[in-house]
Each structure stands twice: as C-alpha cells, then as structure tokens.
C-alpha cells in the first residue's frame, strides 16, 4: 500500500476517489531508501469530515544497517533530519486519506511542509527496532485554491515516547508557489565562503596543539 502511494497507483492505496489523478501530478510519499513508513495499521475518521479529528497509527521498521547510520559519525543516533521524516511522512499519508485535495479536483496541487515544533524527550538507539507513530489530523481549512492542515505526532519505541510535536502542511497551486519570494526576499544569496576572499581565510587543524591553546585547553 505504501509503495503505491510512493511510486504506483494512488487509487490502489486510497480508493476510487483518487482515480481522477491517474496520469496527473499529485502528492507522493518519498520512496526508495527515504521511504520511512513500513505500514499503516490503524486509521480512524471519515473522508471529508474536517470538523472531526482523524487519527492514524503507523510503524517504521528501522534497518539495523540503514544508510543514515552507516554514513554517520555517531552511528547509534538517528539523524534529526531522518527523525523528522519518520514523524512527518505519516502526516502526509493522513492528509491524502482525508480527501482535502479533493476539495479542488480540477487543480494539480503541491504539498508543502510549512511549520512545526518538535521535542526530543529521549535519544534511544533505534537500530533494528520498530518506531510507532501516532498522528492526529486536527484542522483543515480551504480557501482561494489553498488548503492548510495541522497535525500532532508522537513517536515511541518499545512503549516509550521519545519524540513528539506538531506541524502544519499546505496544498498550493504551482502559480501561488511561483509567486512566493521566500525568506531571502527573492535576492540571490551566495555562500559565505564565496563572499570572502580566500587569502583572508585561516585553516585551522582542530587536533593541533596550537588550536587547543587558542581555545584554552
């Protein structure tokens, strides 16, 4: 089912309501080694009933030798960026299942993460374990060809919650995204190192005796 949402036929995942998107661009789950949902096994809430909270429980079977552990200076820690994907991908699943995108069936809408807060309560070693995610779709507001939804998530492993938070996603038309200038106001921002002459840069060996003297060790 998750594979169909990522790369296959979304109708096979979400039902005949989504047959209208055959051959069209629509929201998809990340795939391949960045598909961080193994299964969805508990889903409550009726499609298009946005005045009621919809809930979902999903699981991710964390590979013991996943690429984000192998290529990590601290292989016992799941990188925060990956942890966020584990938390947020089921939010995308419940958003699609809710039918919000069907509010504007004639439009090709793009799904974007807008905001969020997360609290890391513990930092367990997740290698070879299963992470459970309890997600709530709290609100849905549609106006002017745009849809905004808010969620809460709670990640646990072996019965212990270790990461929880809230987030906001939105559906937008391509035209509205093209008109957004972003945090930089539309100005081109070049990397700091490109703005500074190389002859003014200093190479520091973090393991050298001189560097340790500089920082007072």
Predicted regions and their residues:
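Acyl-thioester-processing domains in fatty-acid/polyketide/NRPS systems
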Residues: 1-217
């Amino acid at each position: 089912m998750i594979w169909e949402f990522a790369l296959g036929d979304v109708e096979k995942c979400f039902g005949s309501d989504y047959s209208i998107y055959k051959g069209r661009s629509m929201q998809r789950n990340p795939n391949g080694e960045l598909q961080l949902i193994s299964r969805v096994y508990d889903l409550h809430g009726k499609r298009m009933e946005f005045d009621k909270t919809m809930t979902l429980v999903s699981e991710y079977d964390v590979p013991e030798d996943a690429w984000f552990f192998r290529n990590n200076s601290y292989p016992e820690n799941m990188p925060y960026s990956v942890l966020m994907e584990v938390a947020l991908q089921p939010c995308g699943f419940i958003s699609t299942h809710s039918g919000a995108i069907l509010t504007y069936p004639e439009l090709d809408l793009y799904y974007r993460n807008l905001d969020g807060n997360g609290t890391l309560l513990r930092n367990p070693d997740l290698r070879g374990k299963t992470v459970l995610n309890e997600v709530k779709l709290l609100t849905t507001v549609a106006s002017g060809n745009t849809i905004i939804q808010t969620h809460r998530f709670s990640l646990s492993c072996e019965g212990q919650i270790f990461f929880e938070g809230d987030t906001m996603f939105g559906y937008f038309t391509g035209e509205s995204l093209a008109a957004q200038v972003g945090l930089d106001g539309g100005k081109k921002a070049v990397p700091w190192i490109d703005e500074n002459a190389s002859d003014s840069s200093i190479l520091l060996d973090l393991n050298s005796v001189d560097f340790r003297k500089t920082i007072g060790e």
